[in-house]
Curated annotation (Swiss-Prot):
Residue positions of the active site: 245 (proton acceptor)
Residues at which Ca(2+) 2 binds: 473, 475, 477, 484
Full protein name: Calcium-dependent protein kinase 5
InterPro entries: CDPK_Ser/Thr_kinases (IPR050205), EF-hand-dom_pair (IPR011992), EF_Hand_1_Ca_BS (IPR018247), EF_hand_dom (IPR002048), Kinase-like_dom_sf (IPR011009), Prot_kinase_dom (IPR000719), Protein_kinase_ATP_BS (IPR017441), Ser/Thr_kinase_AS (IPR008271)
PANTHER family per UniProt: SERINE/THREONINE-PROTEIN KINASE
Annotated residues for binding of Ca(2+) 1: 438, 440, 442, 449
Annotated ATP binding sites: 131-139, 154
Annotated source species: Plasmodium falciparum (isolate 3D7)
GO cellular component terms attached to this protein's record: cytoplasm; cytoplasmic vesicle; extrinsic component of cytoplasmic side of plasma membrane; extrinsic component of membrane; microneme membrane; nucleus; plasma membrane
């Protein structure tokens, strides 16, 4: 067995309770054979090959000596570029196509994450106090010099990167995420020596620390945690993304309040795998790893196993598969046998035990999936404790939807960019409202889910409400993402802040010359268009909506007046 210490952790147990963090070992199989059942090793070498879905192997990404991430082919090909097909000799604005009423605002968010040419030191004041330490570098706290918002920055030393492909995949996966319980990646910076990932700040500590502090949780407290974990998994699995290293150390509390939400972090082992496809690389952490991973053939239900282990620990304070060392732990995982044999389990309901058993089903093909988990009777009995949408909130939200519907397309995009950058304090109760609307827990809203909560059984009113909700669905797929929902519900006082507006303006001003041109607007809007692009006439009309001095551009003063509602 080859051990690779990924984080500064050690092992020490007393009376069956976890007392300190265990040493993490990564798994690798050189040639993935059925005989390598308990082999742990460093998964950095050739990671791009062994971690890809066995039916979805793709070409390796290209490297660059200095800007290995942001200038690599995979990221250049993924920048804003418009979806219509235009030859290099043509003016893209002369390529007239029918206008679609839909454009995907969430797609813009995914792209602006990697569109940063500033120096990190020009944008952030770095606090040298370390929030965490990993094999590649440190995580520190930082404050935006422009907005005052606090962030966490993961500083990665390039010389310590053994597998560039894994890091690229981590970033590409993270920038697709838009869920209340998945940590946000805001920006990526890079210089010759380091890579900087600007992340949502979560300073409430690890779930692991809470387990050490309290020992075990009541069923209701465990329910609140597991509901958030499974909702995040539902969202990921629907995108054919698996985390593969779920554990209490990778679950953070946003703050120190009693009802602080949690965020799932560390997507370094995450991978894509299509339905009915299997992966074969062996990665994970001994206590939480699924037995089928050790056998070298598994799918996204490996995350369900890990979640079942977490739920088990929450309810009793110790792991279902324990041992003096990693070898002993893995042998027990391979057998998949566990019991509810202590006094702790006497007070735990049969429903909770049944759900754990279904999550820890040894045969992963028969294991419960995340949709079935959230329909389990254990979850249903706590559902009545969720936020109840009252009539006052109904009226407020509907008014917000009306206001949002009246906004021009540019402002809708700008508001969406602003919504993505907000922290928990700015979002307020909207997060709980989103979760209350999300009946099936998949991390996105359907028009039907919102309509059922807000309708008043008045035909005329309900028709108007349904129409407004259709407008929130900007890409026409019937789903409303978390950031799209926040953007439609935000208090407009947020837009009065100059620094907030300036940041939104910079998203559109691609070359930083102080004005938004037709070409820049075309690049942004055509990228977010669904199936078709925008004609030259449409782009010109959008500019005219904001261009008060008719010079053909949108300067910052015009943009600010649009955002704040100030009229000439």
């Amino acid at each position: 067995m080859k051990e690779t210490e990924v984080e500064d952790m050690d092992t020490n147990r007393k009376d069956g309770k976890i007392k300190k963090k265990e040493k993490i070992v990564n798994m690798k199989n050189e040639e993935v054979k059925s005989t390598t059942k308990s082999t742990l090793a460093d998964s950095d070498e050739d990671y791009s090959i062994i971690t890809l879905c066995t039916k979805c192997l793709s070409k390796k990404l290209e490297d660059n000596k200095n800007r290995i991430i942001l200038d690599s082919k995979a990221f250049k090909d993924n920048r804003l570029k418009g979806r219509c097909s235009v030859s290099s000799n043509e003016d893209p604005l002369d390529n007239k196509l029918n206008l679609s009423p839909y454009f995907d605002r969430s797609q813009i968010i995914q792209e602006i994450i990697l569109m940063n040419n500033d120096e990190l030191s020009d944008v952030y004041e770095i606090d040298r106090y370390k929030l965490g330490k990993g094999s590649y570098g440190n995580v520190v706290k930082a404050v935006s010099k422009r907005t005052g918002q606090q962030r966490a920055i993961k500083i990665i030393e390039k010389k310590k990167i053994h597998n560039i492909e894994r890091l690229k995949r981590e970033i590409l996966i993270m920038k697709q995420m838009d869920h209340p319980n998945i940590i946000k990646l805001y920006e990526v910076y890079e210089d010759n020596e380091k890579l900087y990932l600007v992340l949502e700040l979560c300073d409430g500590g690890e779930l692991f620390d809470k387990i050490v502090k309290y020992g075990s949780f009541s069923e209701y407290e465990a329910y609140k945690i597991m509901k958030q974990i499974f909702s995040a998994l539902y969202y990921c699995h629907s995108k054919n993304i698996m985390h593969r290293d779920l554990k209490p150390e990778n679950i953070l509390y946003v703050d120190n309040t009693e009802d602080s939400p949690i965020q799932i972090i560390d997507w370094g082992f995450a991978s894509k795998c299509m339905n009915n496809h299997n992966l074969k690389s062996v990665v994970g952490t001994p206590y939480y790893i699924a037995p089928e991973i050790l056998r070298g053939k598994y799918d996204k239900r490996c995350d369900i196993w890990s979640s079942g282990v977490i739920m088990y620990i929450l309810l009793c304070g110790y792991p279902p598969f324990n041992g003096k060392n990693n070898d002993e732990i893995l042998k027990k995982v391979e057998k998949g046998e566990f019991v509810f044999d202590s006094n702790y389990w006497a007070r735990v309901s049969d429903d909770a035990k049944d759900l754990i058993c279904q999550c820890l089903n040894y045969n992963y093909k028969e294991r419960i999936d995340v949709e079935q988990v959230l329909k389990h009777r254990w979850f249903k009995k706590f559902k009545s404790n969720n936020l109840i949408i009252n009539k006052t909130l109904n009226k407020t939200l509907i008014e917000k939807f009306k206001e949002f519907h009246k906004l021009c397309k540019i402002k809708k995009l700008a508001v969406t960019c602003i919504a993505y950058q907000l922290n928990e304090k700015d979002i307020g109760k909207l997060k709980k409202t989103f979760e209350a609307f999300d009946h099936n827990g998949d991390g996105v809203l359907t028009i039907s889910e919102i309509f059922q909560c807000l309708k008043v059984n008045d035909n005329e009113f309900d028709r108007e409400l349904y129409f407004l909700l259709k407008q929130l669905d900007t890409d026409g797929n019937g789903l409303i993402d978390y950031t799209e929902f926040l953007a439609a519900c935000l208090d407009h006082s947020i837009f009065q802040q100059d620094v907030i507006c300036r940041n939104a303006f910079n998203v559109f001003d691609l070359d930083g010359d102080g004005v938004i041109t037709k070409d820049e607007l075309f690049k942004i809007l055509s990228f977010s268009a669904v199936q078709v692009s925008f004609s030259k006439e449409i782009i010109e009309n959008l500019i005219k909506e904001v261009d008060s001095n008719n010079d053909g551009f949108i300067d910052y003063d015009e943009f600010y007046k649009m955002m704040t509602g100030v009229k000439e």
